[in-house]
Swiss-Prot record:
Keywords: Lyase. This is Decarboxylase AgnL1. It comes from Paecilomyces divaricatus (Penicillium divaricatum). Pathway: Secondary metabolite biosynthesis. Belongs to the tpcK family. The gene is AgnL1.
Length: 149
């Protein structure tokens, strides 16, 4: 079994087309409304974060907010295989090439001063979960693709 600190090799493909994706399955701070949570993430936190992410090589950053309304739509998709509804409030995905660059961003003095404390204003950081994996892109803009760009 490989050492957990070792970065696994990317899947086969052209250099510069293999990206890692950090997926954060987030919960909002207890007592915070869905509307306030989304507003803080998109209108307060994102504007403070996005330029720093670009500086450190982030290729893409998306947020998917799961609201009461969108969760209700899931009943239309359930079948014998899709039966379990995830209870996360948001899925935030950050795409980058280098774990080291992302770590450097988190160690940046500006990040430490402005963003670490901001997370506590909207997120339940003790319940939120995360994972990291290689992206395999199959369809983009309605077309079958070979590789991530």
């Amino acid at each position: 079994m490989p050492d957990a600190s070792e970065i696994p090799p990317p899947p086969p493909g052209a250099p510069g087309t293999q990206f890692l994706c950090l997926t954060i399955c987030g919960y909002r701070r207890p007592g915070m409304s869905e509307e306030d949570y989304r507003h803080h993430m998109t209108q307060v936190s994102a504007p403070m974060t996005q330029d720093l992410m670009v500086k450190y090589g982030v290729k893409r950053w998306t947020m998917v907010h799961n609201t009461s309304e969108t969760r209700a739509l899931m009943s239309r998709l359930f079948d014998h295989q899709m039966t379990q509804l995830a209870d996360f409030d948001c899925f935030s995905q950050v795409v980058f090439e280098s774990v080291e660059e992302y770590r450097r961003m988190k160690e940046d003095a500006w990040y430490q001063e402005h963003l670490v404390g901001d997370h506590e204003k909207f997120a339940d950081t003790q319940r939120s979960r995360m994972t990291l994996g290689w992206i395999t892109e199959l369809i983009r803009d309605g077309k079958v693709v070979k590789g991530t760009q």
